[in-house]
Amino acid sequence: MARSPEILADNLFFPEGPRWRTGPTPKLWFSDILAGKVMTVDLAGSVETLADVPESPSGLGWWPDGRLVVVSVNDGKLMSVSAGTSK
């Protein structure tokens, strides 16, 4: 018998590239390409927007120091995000 999936977050436009991060507050990180946002969802289901990336955020990664790296597809940029800002 197939299992029914559990909804972790809804009202998203085009969620992409989920990445799990452990730590004091484990979260699933993902891009919402059409909304232009990098977001997280925690184990309790709380969704948070971490960065606005208007030109379609896609792949995510991290520098060794913990800063987020985001691919911005439409403008061909690789961006670093720290403390709520993108550059």
Predicted regions, residues:
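Sequence-structural signature of mature extracellular/luminal beta-sheet repeat domains
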Residues: M1-K87
